[in-house]
Amino acid sequence: MEAALRVVRYIKEAPGLGLLMPTGNTTQLTAFCDSDWGACMETRRSVTGYLVKLGEGLISWKSKKQETVSRSSAEAEFRSMAACAAEVTWLIGLYKELGINVSLPVNMVCDSKAAIQIAANPIFHERTKHIDIDCHFVRERIC
């Protein structure tokens, strides 16, 4: 209850702040994902970032250090795609529960040609076997 009162007080004190959603009836989700390879100087873990838009309105975003060290920039980007695909899957389920039909397929934008090729290639090699689970997850969501 205390947390709810705190939120209400914050909203009352800051009436001009907020995220504005553009008007329109588009139901197209667009997702953008990116990562930086080995950015953390202490752990050499990459940082994943993604954002999801419904039409022109930003509805979800996240930036987080990856759980494991990536051995290539393509692997770091691919893990970013997997995190983004998981968020998009959750958002689609949420919108279905709310009775909102989302246009499929969802556009996912990634700036790594290598990560896109890994997602599209049905054959695993020794160099990509360790990201096998993420790869299957992304493939199920984007194909």
Region spans (language model):
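Divalent metal-binding acidic/histidine catalytic loops
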Residues: M1-C143
